[in-house]
Curated annotation (Swiss-Prot):
Residues 254-418 form the Helicase ATP-binding domain. It holds the Pfam family T1R_D3-like. Its EC number is 3.1.21.3. One of its GO terms (molecular function) is DNA binding. Keywords: ATP-binding, DNA-binding, Endonuclease, Hydrolase, Nuclease, Nucleotide-binding, Restriction system. ATP binds at residues 268-274. Belongs to the HsdR family. It catalyses: Endonucleolytic cleavage of DNA to give random double-stranded fragments with terminal 5'-phosphates, ATP is simultaneously hydrolyzed. This is Type I restriction enzyme SauN315I endonuclease subunit. It comes from Staphylococcus aureus (strain N315).
């Protein structure tokens, strides 16, 4: 049977959308798009216009107000009302989207709209709501990687989406059998923000036909755009909610408005509960019969975090309460429908000010409780419940309490909240790519196998600090971490947390790391944090120090490393700085290993954290919460969260995964065995060799389809290698896997050469190639050790008086440059070669090699600008101005560019603009490091 063509798929979709209720219209260019928009605008505002449609001047004034805006600003305008001055000086307000009565909007669909700006483009399927193109659908025929459609959208958005197309809210991409949706944005579109749609039971809806049936019905689509897309005010981005978030909010709203019952939402850690709970809170706060929505968090440190998150989603949506009296005032303020506070403050407010809160004894109040397994167990909840007689309680948790892991008083989450309204389990999140799976190692630190036996009496007998914290064992664990940390974290590209059983253990490990660190060529950056008790027990004199003294030393070490000034009197500030450090790094440096007891193991999200070292006992919710610190999605170089256990927690891990994934099959959550990945590698390697038997044969490939096959085959191989490297037993040798590291490096060099070739051809020619939209996943190829700084370090070590040694160093650098995989290093490759060949031999021992290289680059950059400007007959200084602007903004200033190009014919103008944009981007990257 022949495959379905892209044209047939598009035609099938157009027919289906027409059947779903869209009006099929023919719009082929920008003029027809504007005419259609104007007609609908007049129809929708007929009453306000009083029989006088917008004149040409009035419509032009409107276009001036709404055109040329950023995607973020356009999204705001879409949801707002816009005042328009008419020719007779009267003023009317125009709206572009009915956000409440979704079905009252006008729905149209068209296809093959052609746009010609800098580049030509023809869009597949465009959905118009009230005449504005709000959803763009890009299709690929069956069998084509869906990522090619994603990359095509990125290319179109960068080159072609102007005018009313700036109002696109959402993209849908499909190859017929796989379909995704994602929000439009000014910033770079990320693959991690492409979402699957699913049903309420989290069954994925993949085919384009079933996706359209469920997601693209006119009223449903308008509802999705109006209610379930969020304007993030802080980051100035549009966010589309995922299906499970939508279903949870719908279920919660229904429970709150149609019943008087409570309920809870079980969404796994890392799945975006804050956004879900915010949207539910926001919608409930707009209901007339609900007098107040109170969002409760448990801990002080989460209070500000949650407020910050909420205000991202709607500026000023939350008034954080700083003290009890302020909370009472806010509760009585009718202009504040939504409040974020802690359960501790709420309990105090009731205890001391119950008479001021009398109205809430009968008024309907809704409490939304974040991480309810922490905040809802205890006397404070009972106190709040006794006062608010007509309240409903809705909890959000990633790890509910069940009979197996119930609270101290034996209650489960269901005992307190009643029915579970929606679930999204860890296996669902991993399947959808919303969180990562885990690679778990168990390192035996005892020679005596009896210590791993099932005998409980033996386990109890050895479960003492004396055994676990024996000097030899602590050093053994520390050395294992030091020896393997670079492998686990991809040469320190990622951070890690080390959790231990007690403050005493934390101190001992910190001091051991500190001692062993001194012997390392590249010392690890270690930090420790814990909460000390002012009047702590000295354990009968066993520990000859107060823990505060040790924390002071740790903070002092931290201050020296990061140029800060914290002390044990400012532990909150120290905590916040560490939190920021582990999330993003500080001043080009970051913590490699953070040692904790319990801190940072719940409620802390960091995409650049990928490894958890464990030397303590963990069970059920504590284990899942701790493991989940590592599994936030980042990029291709982070395929899983790495867990290294120095205790045998195999049973505890299996039990926790069984409970919280509701299945005995943990294969979807844990990485498969080494042998399985090895077999997968062998199959992929054979496939690669069938396409190109040797690396140098890549150079002989003329056919683009064949080149594409090579790219796809090596990309798959590289992904498997990334996973194999996580296993201790992996050896990159012919004996072990049939391929050695050198052969892989040779194939990788050819792969990167194809990438460079495609990138260069795309920049230089207005030509569409089947390779344009291939996803090369370059991040996966990077080795963060071999970069520009690495090369500069070798250059600094050159003995300028020893010519033989100098030649050896030069040859070493040439070999490294031949196999460079760092993008910036590849750009600088020719520069560095010329520097070591022509400049280094003439230097003497008194010369500063760094300064010499800076001078060399400066001369080369000046020559490049002069040469390019002369060749194109453009003003060199104007070119430098554009380049300087680009360096800070990342955007080529269109006004400066237009002025520089002047009055060339359209075709020549397009060619010149493309060449200048490409030159500016490449030279900025090349000379910017």
């Amino acid at each position: 049977m022949a495959y379905q063509s892209e044209y047939a798929l598009e035609n099938e979709m157009m027919n289906q959308l027409e059947q779903l209720g869209y009006e099929r219209v023919t719009i082929r260019d920008n003029k027809q798009l504007l005419d259609n928009f104007r007609t609908i605008l007049n129809e929708r505002h007929a009453d306000k216009l009083e029989g006088n449609p917008l004149t040409d001047k009035e419509f032009q004034r409107l276009l001036t107000m709404i055109d040329g805006k950023s995607i973020f600003e356009s999204a705001r305008i879409l949801r707002d009302k816009l005042p328009l001055r008419r020719d007779d000086e009267s003023e009317i307000y125009l709206s572009f989207l009915d956000k409440k009565s979704w079905c009252k909007n006008k729905f149209q669909v068209t296809n093959q709209v052609s746009v010609e700006d800098t580049y030509k483009a023809r869009y597949d399927v465009t959905i118009l709501i009230n005449g504005l193109p709000l959803v763009q659908v890009e299709l690929k025929r069956r069998g084509i990687d869906i990522n090619e459609a994603f990359n095509q959208v990125k290319r179109y958005r960068k080159q072609n989406y102007t005018g009313l197309f700036r109002y696109i809210q959402m993209f849908i991409i499909s190859n017929g059998v796989e379909t995704r949706y994602f929000s439009n944005n000014d910033s770079e579109l990320l693959k991690s923000h492409m979402f699957y749609w699913s049903d309420k039971q989290n069954n994925r809806i993949n085919t384009l036909q079933s996706f359209a049936e469920s997601f693209m019905r006119p009223c449903q689509l308008a509802k999705m755009i109006s209610r379930y897309m969020i304007i993030n005010e802080t980051d100035r981005i549009l966010m589309a909610m995922r299906p499970y978030q939508v279903y949870a909010v719908e279920a919660l709203i229904q429970q709150a408005t149609e019943t008087g019952n409570n309920g809870y939402v079980w969404h796994t850690t890392g799945s975006g509960k804050t956004l879900t709970s915010f949207k539910a809170s926001q919608i409930l706060s707009q209901q007339d019969d609900i007098k107040k929505v109170i969002f409760l968090v448990d801990r002080k440190d989460l209070d500000s975090q949650t407020e910050e998150e909420f205000n991202k989603f709607a500026k000023g949506a939350v008034d954080k309460t700083f003290n009890t009296s302020q909370l009472v005032r806010q509760l009585n303020d009718k202009s504040l429908p939504l409040i974020v506070t802690t359960i501790q403050k709420m309990a105090k407010a009731i205890q001391g000010n119950a008479h001021l809160l009398e109205q809430y004894k009968t008024n309907k109040v809704v409490f939304i409780i974040d991480e309810c397994h922490r905040s809802q167990f205890g006397d404070m909840h009972r106190l709040v419940k006794q006062h608010f007689k007509n309240a409903q309680y809705f909890g959000f948790t990633g790890t509910p309490r069940f009979p197996e892991n119930s609270s101290q008083d034996g209650r489960t989450t269901a005992d307190i909240f009643g029915r579970c309204l929606h679930t999204y389990l860890i296996r669902d999140a991993i399947h959808d790519g919303n969180v990562l799976g885990f690679s778990v190692d168990y390192i035996n630190t005892f020679k005596n196998k009896a210590l791993k036996a099932e005998d409980n009496s033996m386990v109890e007998a050895i479960d003492t600090e004396e055994v676990w914290l024996a000097d030899k064992r602590v050093e053994l664990v520390t050395r294992h971490i030091i020896n393997n940390h670079d492998k686990y974290t991809r040469n320190r590209q990622y951070s890690s947390i080390f959790t231990v059983q007690s403050i005493h253990a934390l101190i001992k490990y910190y001091e051991t790391f500190k001692r062993l660190n001194k012997k390392l060529e590249q010392p690890l950056t270690i930090a420790g944090i814990f909460t000390f008790k002012p009047n702590e027990d000295d354990r009968d004199g066993e520990v000859p120090y107060h823990s505060r003294e040790k924390l002071e030393i740790m903070i002092s070490d931290y201050n020296k490393k990061f140029e800060t000034n914290f002390s044990t009197d400012t532990t909150n500030e120290y905590f916040n700085h560490i939190s920021k450090n582990v999330k993003k790094g500080v001043k080009d440096s970051k913590i490699d290993i953070l040692i904790v007891v319990n801190m940072f193991l719940t409620g802390f999200d960091s995409k650049v954290l990928n490894t958890l070292y464990v030397d303590k006992n963990l069970m059920y919710h504590d284990l899942i919460q701790a493991y989940s610190r590592t599994n936030r999605v980042e990029k291709e170089s982070k395929p899983f969260g790495k867990i290294v256990n120095y205790r045998d927690l195999k049973k505890e891990t299996d039990d926790a995964l069984r409970v919280f994934s509701q299945t005995n099959d943990t294969d979807t959550i844990l990485m498969r065995s080494y042998e399985e990945y090895k077999k997968e590698f062998m199959d992929a390697y054979r496939e690669l060799k069938m396409i190109v038997p040797t690396p140098h044969m890549v150079d002989d490939i003329q056919d683009e389809e064949e080149l594409k096959r090579f790219v796809e085959a090596y990309r798959l191989l590289a992904k498997i290698i990334l996973r194999l490297k996580a296993f201790d037993e992996f050896e990159f040798t012919i004996d072990e896997i049939g391929m050695d590291e050198q052969e892989n490096e040779d194939y990788k060099s050819k792969y990167l050469a194809v990438y460079d070739q495609v990138k260069r051809a795309t920049a230089e020619k207005n030509k569409v190639s089947i390779l344009n939209d291939i996803d090369f996943e370059i991040e996966m190829m990077r080795n963060d050790t071999i970069n520009v700084n690495y090369i500069m370090n070798i250059l600094r070590q050159i003995d300028l008086e020893d010519k033989a040694e100098q030649r050896r160093n030069q040859e070493q650098i040439r070999r490294i440059l031949d196999h460079a995989d760092d993008p910036t290093l590849r750009l600088k490759r020719d520069l560095i070669r010329e520097f070591i060949d022509n400049v280094v031999p003439s230097l003497n021992k008194d010369d500063d090699i760094d300064q010499e290289y800076v001078n060399f680059e400066s001369i080369k950059k000046e020559a490049e600008f002069k040469g390019f400007a002369g060749e194109r007959s453009i003003d060199e200084q104007a070119l430098k101005t554009i380049s300087n602007d680009y360096q800070y903004s990342g955007v080529v200033n269109p006004h400066h560019l237009k002025k520089m190009i002047g009055d060339l014919p359209l075709k020549e103008k397009r060619k010149a603009r493309k060449a200048i944009e490409s030159f500016v981007a490449e030279t900025t990257e090349k000379y910017g490091v």
